[in-house]
């Protein structure tokens, strides 16, 4: 059995909830649809819900089984912001936290902090430095870790 098959079997045995903040990217959307169809993870697209659905329709990509967190939904943003502000790891004041609810990359990381997803996956549209900075700011570093590397 090859490495990729082993990894697929391990993922399918214990699917994680994964947030994808770059779902508007066609390559990412196709990958997320395939992951969901193969039940390798519970996929969560984070972005403009209407635009994600429109792009999926245009591209002929099924979003069946994929949760969408719509960053344009003001009511959902307010509820998420309230939860985040009460979390001990929140480093922002109310206005700063509210701004981050509408930014897919930061919202995905906040979902991770809140335990709504296990992990966030990005890097096709966002620069590595932006991802590291957002992750370090919102999620933070593990105890004993003081240096970040993208290698």
Model-predicted segments: where are they?
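A glycine- and small-aliphatic-rich helix-loop capping segment at beta-alpha/alpha-beta transitions
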Residues: 127-147
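Short beta-strand elements
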Residues: 149-151
